[in-house]
């Protein structure tokens, strides 16, 4: 068996000969494809990758340039490529993909001979929206994989790929119908992006790339690369998050907010940079909640149950509850202008709406945990009370605000069991505890309240029980069933 150096030199000589002969035209591309395939197989092994010289990559550049020229002069319907148009460049991309695996010298050679620029031009041809042929799609995918491998761990190559692919190639790939194209392009984007590049996405002319990442993630929620792009890069740039949110539709906002909630809820400790960025994002989302919170009242109408905007409001509230439950983030929202007032106000409005007519905000006593736990209104009042309690934790100023807004009586009026608001009673007790801690004024207010009889006991009756008050105490008694007639 020939030594690795000789085998590689032999395949390279074959390729050089093929390119120099008349048979190197389109009708004989199958021969060239076979030679490149053998080279691809060799590059699967590290020893051959390490022996590769720049002239090999110059030969592959010649092939790709020849393919590009052939496609340009071919008199074919738009997007209609022959198999030979696609199979040879696909094999070239596989060869380059293999050559760049954990091999910085090959990454440098690929970049230096101009293969990145030529490859991106050809990839864009195969990735045009009207191109639907499977062979072209395969070449498209292989080209993206090559770009990812040539950029991996190589800053200069990352910058070269970014210069050629941003924003047009990324935009066309992220909205592509093929899931693999979306996945591979997001891998390339993640590999190339850094803090400086993230900041450029805020430019209105470039923002569509960031928007497309979130939209693609909503379509493919198991796509790890898009998840990492948002978590590791977008969420470190509050200005970008703000620009993305303000440009999104309600369903897209829900996706972004769920990603933010996931970041806040993660168990791993945050870095100082992550913590600072999330606090800035939370302050922005606090303003959004105050602006949008009253749209939740649309849900009082049965016809509005499919509205997306109220779902956005519930996700905003989820985030605010989670942020204020962590001591390191609490103070940034305790001082947010208008947030506490908005929470008390919308609690009052939803509570009143539930009393005025039968709707999703009416307390339900069914012993079945509500009819639809996925409804946007489920848990909304409980989470409002949770937020109010968090904002008042060891904060005298906010305790006083709730007192002035008559919020204590409002919270106490929400202490009954409500299947539409799991743990409502517990969150109300928690909020009252935080409102009265080291606050004599609020304690005296509660102490001065008069007993007004028993609350609605329909739930007890449905269980065959009734409550009686005797000597200042409550007693539970079973209800005797009336004899059947």
UniProtKB/Swiss-Prot annotation:
Keywords: Cell cycle, Cell division, Cytoplasm. GO terms for cellular component: centriole; ciliary basal body; cytoplasm; midbody; perinuclear region of cytoplasm. It is found in: Cytoplasm, Perinuclear region; Midbody. SUPFAM superfamilies: ARM repeat. PANTHER family: ATAXIN-10. Belongs to the ataxin-10 family. May play a role in the regulation of cytokinesis. May play a role in signaling by stimulating protein glycosylation. Induces neuritogenesis by activating the Ras-MAP kinase pathway and is necessary for the survival of cerebellar neurons. Does not appear to play a major role in ciliogenesis. This is Ataxin-10.
């Amino acid at each position: 068996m020939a030594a690795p150096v000789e085998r590689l030199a032999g395949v390279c000589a074959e390729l050089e000969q093929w390119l120099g002969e008349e048979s190197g035209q389109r009708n004989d591309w199958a021969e060239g494809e076979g030679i490149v395939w053998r080279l691809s197989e060799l590059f699967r092994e590290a020893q051959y990758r390490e022996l590769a010289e720049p002239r090999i990559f110059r030969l592959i550049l010649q092939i790709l340039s020849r393919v590009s020229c052939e496609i340009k002069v071919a008199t074919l319907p738009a997007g209609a490529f022959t198999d030979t148009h696609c199979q040879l460049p696909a094999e070239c991309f596989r060869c380059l993909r293999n050559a760049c695996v954990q091999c910085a010298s090959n990454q440098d050679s690929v970049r230096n001979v101009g293969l990145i620029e030529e490859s991106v031009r050809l990839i864009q041809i195969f990735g045009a929206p009207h191109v639907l042929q499977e062979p072209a799609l395969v070449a498209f995918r292989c080209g993206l994989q090559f770009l990812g491998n040539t950029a991996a761990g190589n800053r200069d190559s990352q910058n070269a790929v970014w210069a050629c692919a941003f924003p047009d190639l990324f935009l066309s790939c992220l909205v592509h119908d093929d899931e693999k194209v979306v996945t591979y392009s997001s891998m390339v984007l993640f590999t190339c992006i850094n803090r400086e590049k993230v900041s450029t996405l805020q430019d209105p002319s470039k923002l569509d790339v960031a928007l497309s990442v979130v939209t693609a993630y909503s379509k493919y929620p198991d796509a790890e690369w898009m998840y990492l792009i948002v978590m590791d890069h977008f969420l470190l740039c509050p200005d970008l998050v703000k620009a993305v949110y303000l440009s999104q539709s309600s369903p897209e906002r829900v996706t972004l907010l769920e990603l933010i909630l996931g970041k806040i809820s993660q168990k791993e400790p945050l870095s100082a940079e992550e913590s600072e960025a999330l606090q800035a994002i939370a302050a922005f989302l606090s303003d959004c909640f105050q602006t949008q919170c009253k749209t939740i009242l649309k849900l009082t109408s049965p016809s509005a149950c499919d509205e997306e905007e109220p779902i956005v409001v519930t996700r905003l509230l989820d985030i605010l509850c989670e942020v204020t439950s962590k001591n390191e983030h609490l103070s940034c929202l305790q001082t947010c202008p208008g947030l506490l007032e908005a929470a008390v106000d919308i609690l009052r409005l939803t509570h009143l709406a539930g009393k005025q007519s039968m709707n999703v905000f009416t307390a339900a006593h069914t012993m079945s945990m509500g009819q639809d736990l996925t409804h946007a209104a489920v848990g909304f009042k409980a989470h409002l009370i949770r937020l109010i309690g968090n904002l008042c934790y060891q904060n005298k100023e906010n305790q006083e605000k709730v007192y002035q807004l008559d919020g204590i009586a409002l919270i106490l009026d929400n202490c009954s069991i409500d299947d539409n608001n799991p743990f409502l009673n517990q969150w109300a007790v928690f909020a009252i505890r935080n409102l009265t801690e080291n606050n004599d004024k609020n304690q005296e207010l509660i102490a001065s309240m008069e007993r007004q009889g028993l609350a609605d006991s329909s739930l007890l009756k449905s269980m065959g029980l009734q409550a009686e008050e005797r000597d200042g105490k409550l007693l539970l008694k079973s209800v005797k069933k009336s004899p059947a007639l």
